[in-house]
């Protein structure tokens, strides 16, 4: 027969099981508002029954139940849903970051008319137009100087605002990288704790919740995926690279760049290799700083560099009312100081590069003339060199267009004297300097004897900026050194002109070499730059530049806002779904507590009854 005391053990197990169930429900209620908490459920099962192989077995039940047992306490989670949220969440934070920063950029472009670059540029051209109609008027010359100063102030103000956004982005990148490193280290530490806990037979639900919360936060910062092929090794991958493997975490570091406004690039701390992050807050911040803001600053610098160079080219060849000539109207205070463009790029005290912005050939060319020979020109490009071929039937204009249509970071045009001009553009790679011609080579004669830029054909006669005195490869061509810093941040009206407005040059010498006080041909030529294709990145006028800039910023801002709304709607649905599965419902937990309380009370009553039965056997049989 069964043990007389077996009922006490059975009742004890029931009381303990219902106690655990009530405690778990209370734990759920306590953490109803805890971020990342998943509700827990007690998994109950029948305790192993007794198998009694006795002689009377055929006449009686052979297996006697022993009550209940707590099998485990588990979190209520949907792993597939969690993985989907992890994959989707980085896109929401990516577009949220872009939307926030494009709001700032749009504010820079939506500045009031009286201080905008475009408005002041229009007034600057109008002042030259007025001077062309009144070349003997000192008031008209003063207007040119005053409006020139207003224009440079507007350009510098816009540059400072864009640089301010860039600095803010750089600061945000720094703090976000620290967050990523912190989350990765915490996840690795939790992995070790979870493995130890499971090794002792525990089910570390709260540790798992903390790890999942960190993964959630990390997925907002970068494009990550998780997997656990080995039950004891939880892994986090970032854009295909291992970030966390079990108890080991990799970290990021930031390294300053010489030619990127002092900004820093992201590298892996252990290997020092470049790290690439797409998606998430960090991916958006890096893209905004190194692509969007960099493009806006480069665009402003390109406009400033080209328009001032064109104005100066006319002005220095013209004469003022005081017969002064050779003056640039605009000056920069940040050009390479060495006359040959030699520059110490690595900071070791020795010249190691040549920073040249513009070459001007020595030969006057006819744009419609067929060149009559063939060859291949080589120019520096975004990643390596770019080759541009030419053929005997090509005209000069065709060859120039082919250069400009190529992916080379050099642009070409014929100047006012029909001499070929090559100019360095902004660099796509952040590690290359802007407005620096890095490589020019010609296997034939177009850039050598025909246009008068290079002294010899082939590799031996090539110009390459990677050493000092590279200008020695030029065939007497004029050249202009490059700016070291941003042209838009340091442009000014020449102090000589500001101190004496008569130095504003509006006239050219006539055929006899005399300067006529009523001549205004230079003023007309400068005023006409407004509607001339001046090679701002592509063949565009200054008006085209301003229209394109505002349109591009507006479209990108609209794109960010629309994509943010779309991803927010998706994420709201996914979070609602997860909350319905893993979230704590107070009413449901209270209902469970009442249910388990009744079970507890019944088990206690059962123990009391069994106690009375034992008391009868022990004390009341009268034996």
Protein language model annotation of sequence segments:
Residues 1-623:
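Structural signature of extracellular appendage/secretion-system components
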